Amino acid sequence: MSKSASRARLLEIIRRRSFGRGEVTLASGRKSDFYFNLKPTMMDPEGATLLAELTYEALKDDGYDYIGGLEMGAVPLAGAIAQISWIKGHPIAAFFVRKKPKEHGARLAIEGLTRDETLAGKRIVVVEDVTTTGGSAMKAVETLREAGAEVSLVFTMVDREEGAAEAFAAAGLSFRALYKAREFL
């Protein structure tokens, strides 16, 4: 399937499985008359594959060492993208950032690394399913930067276009999206 055909097919899947109308309160606290819940698309075999392939194709030439983001939305995305990257011969390892470190066991804030691995000095792309103001992604970015990671890009599946681009620019981050919310409205 061509890139444009894959993109069109994924838009259909997101519209059917993950887009809805009705008043909701977003993670940012804002009210909206439409919403995206990408988890049904991320858990669908075709949807997950298309999300991963299109994201991988957008990132493959940028030289990233790791891909990940804040739990929960980034977990299936990062795993699927890592798998596709290995299949395509250009591995990008995955991780995820906990909203708060575990209070037992190793008490980690960043999961997916071995005891000997570090993100210090590594090129990281933060990925998320839906971005509104950028607050959730910035939590991950802050944790990663504290760990010494070089975070330069936030990549989202759907940008609601409600201030995230400006917030990321102010933090010295590039921002890219597979889709803009207006493509579904």
Curated annotation (Swiss-Prot):
CDD domains referenced in this protein's UniProt entry, alphabetically: PRTases_typeI
InterPro entries found in the cross-reference section: OPRT, Or_phspho_trans_dom, PRibTrfase_dom, PRTase-like
Highest taxon of source: Bacteria
Keywords, sorted A to Z: Glycosyltransferase, Magnesium, Pyrimidine biosynthesis, Transferase
Catalyzed chemical reaction(s): orotidine 5'-phosphate + diphosphate = orotate + 5-phospho-alpha-D-ribose 1-diphosphate
Single Gene Ontology BP annotation: 'de novo' UMP biosynthetic process
Family named by the database record: Belongs to the purine/pyrimidine phosphoribosyltransferase family. PyrE subfamily.
Keyword field contains Glycosyltransferase: yes
Function: Catalyzes the transfer of a ribosyl phosphate group from 5-phosphoribose 1-diphosphate to orotate, leading to the formation of orotidine monophosphate (OMP).
Family annotation (Pfam families): Pribosyltran
Cofactor requirement: Mg(2+)
Top EC class for this record: transferase
Pathway: Pyrimidine metabolism; UMP biosynthesis via de novo pathway; UMP from orotate: step 1/2
Subunit architecture: Homodimer.
Entry protein name: Orotate phosphoribosyltransferase
Disulphide-bridged cysteine pairs: none
EC number: 2.4.2.10
Keyword Nucleotide-binding: no
Biological source species: Bradyrhizobium sp. (strain ORS 278)
Binding, orotate: 132, 160
Gene: pyrE
Binding residues for 5-phospho-alpha-D-ribose 1-diphosphate: 98-99, 102, 104, 128-136
Gene Ontology terms, MF aspect: magnesium ion binding; orotate phosphoribosyltransferase activity
